[in-house]
């Protein structure tokens, strides 16, 4: 493989800022790669759109990243993975495309008892992909799908810990607090940015997990399998783009990348 392709960037896209939570994990696990991030905040949230709309927007995002020279693509959006991953892989056969799905399997494996709440967008929870996960892993445990329309908008506005977002999350989670909850799965890549608020509401005994680590492990595996890993000896570069073309959203993107 040509060195220039090996050192080409990995493209990440999301319906907005959420995929930055997955990119953070990539920067931690694979620091010597170059990265391009495309957030489609102009059309956020994807979770309330039709599958056809989500597919169309996902194709546009990948075209943008490929034109920027991406050697591999991470769909850093649960909703876009559910609605579009299959079609994207069929069309772009020559480029590794890695998606993300709710981390239901590890959540169930963590504990032998207790219910698992899956917080996600309506679109993710109604897609075939999630139904298959439920059939596979939800047979012997109570899995509670919890759609959270409106939460993405708080995060896109940079509201990660204000009273408004705290009240929103309390309202969503309080009806389940009388049950034995073992884990909460964050099934939307925006949601890790409010993980601390969720943890405060449900208490320290409840594990909160997302699919970022598994996605980046799969990305790493695919790059190694195709001999496409970067040969850079230094920390790679990161370029961030957003369909809003607004300095405020780019500043917020940089801030979110730095949050630990």
From Swiss-Prot:
What GO molecular functions are on record for this protein?
A: glutamate racemase activity
**Which pathway?**
Cell wall biogenesis; peptidoglycan biosynthesis
Q: Identify the enzyme class.
A: isomerase
So where's the catalytic machinery, residue-wise? Answer: 77 (proton donor/acceptor), 188 (proton donor/acceptor)
Name the catalysed reactions: L-glutamate = D-glutamate
Which keywords does this Swiss-Prot/TrEMBL entry list? Cell shape, Cell wall biogenesis/degradation, Isomerase, Peptidoglycan synthesis
User: What's one Pfam family the UniProt record gives for this protein?
Assistant: Asp_Glu_race
Q: Would you kindly state one Gene Ontology biological process term found in this protein's UniProt entry?
A: regulation of cell shape
- Which residues hold substrate? 14-15, 46-47, 78-79, 189-190
Q: Gene3D superfamilies of this UniProt entry? A: 3.40.50.1860
| UniProt-listed Enzyme Commission number(s) | 5.1.1.3
The residues forming the signal peptide are: none
* Protein function: Provides the (R)-glutamate required for cell wall biosynthesis.
The record's comment on protein family reads:
Belongs to the aspartate/glutamate racemases family.
Q: What is the official name of this protein in its record?
A: Glutamate racemase
Q: Which organism's genome codes for this protein?
A: Clostridium perfringens (strain SM101 / Type A)
């Amino acid at each position: 493989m040509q060195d220039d392709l090996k050192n080409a960037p990995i493209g990440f896209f999301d319906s907005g800022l959420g995929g930055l939570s997955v990119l953070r994990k990539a920067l931690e696990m694979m620091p010597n790669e170059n990265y391009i991030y495309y957030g489609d905040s102009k059309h956020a949230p994807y979770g309330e759109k039709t599958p056809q709309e989500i597919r169309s927007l996902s194709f546009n995002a990948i075209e943008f990243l490929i034109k920027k020279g991406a050697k591999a693509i991470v769909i850093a959006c649960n909703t876009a993975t559910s609605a579009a991953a299959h079609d994207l892989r069929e069309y772009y056969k020559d480029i590794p495309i890695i998606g993300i799905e709710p981390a239901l399997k590890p959540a169930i494996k963590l504990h032998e008892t207790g219910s698992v709440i899956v917080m996600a967008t309506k679109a993710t929870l109604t897609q075939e992909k999630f139904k298959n996960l439920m059939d596979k892993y939800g047979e012997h445990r109570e899995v509670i799908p919890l759609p959270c329309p409106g939460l993405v908008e708080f995060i896109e506005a940079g509201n990660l810990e204000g009273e408004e977002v705290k009240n929103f999350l309390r309202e969503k989670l309080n009806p389940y607090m009388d049950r034995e909850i073992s884990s909460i799965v964050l099934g939307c890549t925006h949601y890790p940015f409010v993980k601390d608020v969720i943890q405060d509401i449900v208490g320290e005994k409840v594990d909160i997990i997302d699919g970022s680590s598994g996605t980046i492990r799969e990305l790493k595996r695919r790059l190694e399998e195709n001999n496409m890993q970067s040969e850079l000896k230094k920390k790679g570069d990161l370029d961030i783009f957003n369909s809003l073309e607004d300095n405020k959203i780019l500043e917020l993107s940089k801030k979110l990348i730095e949050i630990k």
